[in-house]
Regions:
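Conserved acidic/glycine
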Residues: 1-55, 61-62, 251, 257-260, ...
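N-proximal short alpha-helices
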Residues: 3-7, 28, 64, 102-106, ...
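A general secondary-structure junction signal
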Residues: 74, 245-247, 328
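Cofactor-binding active-site loop characterized by glycine-rich and histidine/acidic residues
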Residues: 32, 36-173, 191-197, 202, ...
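A generic secondary-structure signal marking the coil-to-beta-strand transition
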Residues: 22, 66-68, 108, 177, ...
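Residue-level signal for pocket-adjacent positions within structured domains
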Residues: 7, 32, 40-42, 86, ...
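Glycine-rich ThDP/TPP pyrophosphate-binding loop and its adjacent helix/strand module
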Residues: 118-315
Length: 332
């Protein structure tokens, strides 16, 4: 039976969709390694992307990596890898080493930032990145620049004031912002049905005068299509879009959480049957783009990258104690 080549309908060639899969795979393997390092006492904290790689990579591939700004939230390994960060960068951050590009070993893992690639630094209070994304979009519009800002957050963050204030301002001023809510069903331990009185996070868009769409967060092609359309709309001066990607958080909230206290093993096992690493891999095989040999080759190549990044970061120097106050204030 012939399988519909959906990627071709989106203007994506085989090389691009393989690159998407490779980036998803790298995200997963980095994340899995971080958990092993944490459990062996080598790094202090992990906050996971597992289960959300398809949404992150599909979205990031739909943006212009030469001029758009991304304001990722703490799970967005797939976004930052697509925009130019490396496995080595992320490992240096995990180990809090001097070369950590996010903060020189000062920030917690998951607080991504890399000025050269327009990855804007985030802070620990959730949703603070949303007003920043709106501000960058406002500046871009005032200066006549062709840029879009892309900001992500969890469905729990969509209940914070920063989201509503940012969305309202962007809607009123028709700013080129893409708000992407990565709905992974849980705000730490609070399930989605105890967070919303409406059916979908995207239903909130109408109150701010923007389109809202809910898509399958396990399908990178569906997410790509939605984000590409939102980016095109923003560049035409038609304003912001709210996109909700629905997936499932496959790990505990963080390395400090025990998810067995609020969800069942059967629920997690059911979600793993829809894991995008498996389902997108199956699509690539069904369309003849990837076979078992290529899949093994890609896995092997990714593991070499992860192993080299781990070894480098583990052996890299820590920041010097006398540098502790650097970068607290602006420096000449």
């Amino acid at each position: 039976m012939m399988v519909e080549k959906r990627h071709e309908q989106l203007g994506l060639n085989e090389e691009t969709v393989l690159d998407m899969y490779r980036t998803m795979l790298l995200s997963r393997r980095i994340d899995e390694r971080m958990w092993l390092l944490n459990r062996s006492g080598k790094i202090p904290f992990v906050i996971s992307c597992q289960g959300q790689e398809a949404a992150q990579v599909g979205a990031a591939f739909a943006l212009d990596r030469q001029k758009d700004y991304v304001l990722p939230y703490y799970r967005d390994v797939g976004v930052v890898l697509t925009f130019g960060m490396t496995a080595k960068d992320l490992m240096l951050s995990g180990f809090a080493k001097e070369e950590d590009p996010n903060s020189g070993g000062r920030q917690m893992p998951g607080h991504f930032g890399q000025k050269e690639n327009r990855i804007v630094t985030g802070s620990s209070p959730v949703t603070t990145q949303v007003p920043h994304a709106v501000g960058i979009a406002l500046a871009g519009k005032m200066e006549g620049k062709d840029l879009v800002t892309f900001v992500t957050f969890g469905e729990g963050s969509s209940n914070q004031g920063d989201f509503h204030e940012g969305a309202n301002f962007a809607g009123v001023h028709k700013l080129p912002v893409i708000f992407m809510c990565e709905n992974n069903k849980y705000a730490i331990s609070v399930p989605i049905e105890k967070q919303l009185s409406c059916e979908n996070v995207s239903d909130r868009a109408i109150g701010y005068g923007m389109p809202g769409i809910t898509v399958d967060g396990n399908d990178p092609l569906e997410v790509y299509e939605a984000v590409k359309e939102a980016a095109d709309r923003a560049r035409r001066g038609e304003g912001p879009t709210l996109i909700e990607t629905v997936s499932y958080r496959l790990t505990p909230h963080s390395s400090d959480d025990d998810d067995r206290s609020y969800r069942t093993a059967d629920e997690v096992a059911e979600a793993k049957t829809k894991d995008s690493i498996k389902t997108f891999g199956a699509y690539l095989k069904e369309t003849g783009i990837m076979d078992d040999a290529l899949e093994k080759q890609m896995n092997d190549e990714v593991m070499i990258i992860v192993n080299e990044a781990t070894d480098y970061a583990e052996n890299a120097p820590y920041p010097k104690a006398e540098s502790a106050m650097n970068h607290v204030y602006a420096q000449k």
